Curated annotation (Swiss-Prot):
It is found in: Secreted. InterPro entries: Adipolin/Erythroferrone-rel (IPR052136), C1q_dom (IPR001073), Tumour_necrosis_fac-like_dom (IPR008983). Iron-regulatory hormone that acts as an erythroid regulator after hemorrhage: produced by erythroblasts following blood loss and mediates suppression of hepcidin (HAMP) expression in the liver, thereby promoting increased iron absorption and mobilization from stores. Promotes lipid uptake into adipocytes and hepatocytes via transcriptional up-regulation of genes involved in fatty acid uptake. Inhibits apoptosis and inflammatory response in cardiomyocytes via promotion of sphingosine-1-phosphate (S1P) and cAMP-dependent activation of AKT signaling. Residues 84-97 have a biased composition (Basic residues). The modification Hydroxyproline is found at residues 101, 103-104, 106-107, 109. Keywords: Disulfide bond, Glycoprotein, Hormone, Hydroxylation, Secreted, Signal. Residues 40-58, 101-115 have a biased composition (Pro residues). It comes from Rattus norvegicus (Rat). It comes from the Eukaryota. This is Erythroferrone. Residues 186-341 form the C1q domain. The record marks 320 as: Required for correct protein folding in the endoplasmic reticulum.
């Protein structure tokens, strides 16, 4: 059966195989002249087959061939540059996502109130602050004394600190006042007094009476500092010019009940503290009290601030503008203190 095959069919199959091999090797079209096409071999002519052991001859197609994979990778790398860069795209996308700032939102709800701090806790914190201030002040004074006097004895606790730790809450405030009074920044009171009326004084009706004959009580809280007080005349002369706080309190007893009937406009008392005994011409402190609803024993007081020149005196006057006499009881007091210049 093999001998019956025609040699023309074999040659056709061999030509097709050669064409497929040429296409597999990537023979470019530019290797042939333009306009020429591969023509099949005419029948009857057979190309000699190359030996099997000989290596393939080099062709021009290998010098001009391009690997499809390398071309694709080069295209991918070049596509990430320029306008197609991923960094530029991300930045642009972020800018677009931010957009324009909108209006501020409404305020949030109010927070819960803070914790309630009882007064006991606040007082304890105040005590701690006071202890620190006292310790700092005492240590400063101790260092100052060490610079001027030799050291003596071993270290001992401050008496002010010991007293502070042993006192209760009420004593802490008293200690604070004492510390402020002892502080060099607290001004010293140069003039002050507190005196009382020695005996009862009779004041007739429709009369203006200047009170006198005082004494200095020997009780806790009584004070006298500086000159100027005349206990006999009841006049206090200002040792220096300045502002003085003055006060007077009288205990008054009616010796005779006022006449019956409707109260009269003149049935009243005036308590005054005058300068130079000129109550009408100079500034004075005054209190007015009606007698229509008063009892047999009552109290009338006056207080305020006057500016006194050096050498000017003040005194207490009682104006009995009523229809009956009265008595100012002993123990009524008169006081003054220099506030400042």
């Amino acid at each position: 059966m093999a001998s019956t095959r025609s040699p023309g069919g074999a040659r056709t199959l061999l030509a097709c195989a050669s064409l497929l091999a040429a296409m597999g090797l990537g023979v470019p079209e530019s290797a042939e002249p333009v306009g020429t096409q591969a023509r099949p071999q005419p029948p009857g002519t057979e190309l000699p087959a190359p030996p099997a052991h000989s290596p393939p001859e080099p062709t021009i197609a290998h010098a001009h061939s391009v690997d499809p994979r390398d071309a694709w990778m080069l295209f991918v790398k070049q596509s990430d540059k320029g306008i197609n860069s991923k960094k530029r795209s991300r930045t642009k996308a972020r800018r677009l996502k931010l957009g324009l700032p909108g209006p501020p939102g409404p305020p949030g709800p109010q927070g819960p109130p803070g914790p309630f701090i009882p007064s006991e806790v606040l007082l304890k914190e105040f005590q701690l602050l006071l202890k620190g201030a006292v310790r700092q002040r005492e240590s400063t004074e101790h260092c100052t004394r060490d610079l001027t006097t030799p050291a003596s004895g071993g270290p001992s606790r401050d008496p002010v600190t010991q007293e502070l730790e042993s006192q209760d809450q009420g004593a802490v405030l008293a200690l604070l006042a004492a510390t402020l009074a002892q502080s060099p920044r607290a001004p010293r009171v140069e003039a002050a007094f507190h005196c009382r009326l020695r005996r009862d004084v009779q004041v007739e009706r429709r009369a203006l009476h200047e009170l006198g004959v005082y004494y200095l009580p020997e009780v806790e809280g009584a004070f006298r500092r500086g000159p100027g007080l005349n206990l006999t005349s009841g006049q206090y002369t200002a040792p220096v010019a300045g502002f003085y706080a003055l006060a007077a309190t009288l205990h008054v007893a009616l010796t005779k009940q006022p006449r019956k009937g409707p109260p009269q406009p003149r049935d009243r008392l005036r308590l005054l503290i005058c300068i130079q005994s000129l109550c009408q011409h100079n500034a004075s402190l005054e209190t007015v009290m009606g007698l229509e609803n008063s009892s047999e024993l009552f109290t009338i007081s006056v207080n305020g601030v006057l500016y006194l020149q050096t050498g000017h005196y003040t005194s207490v006057f009682l104006d009995n503008a009523s229809g009956s006499s009265l008595t100012v009881r002993g123990g009524s007091h008169f006081s003054a203190i220099l506030l400042g210049l």
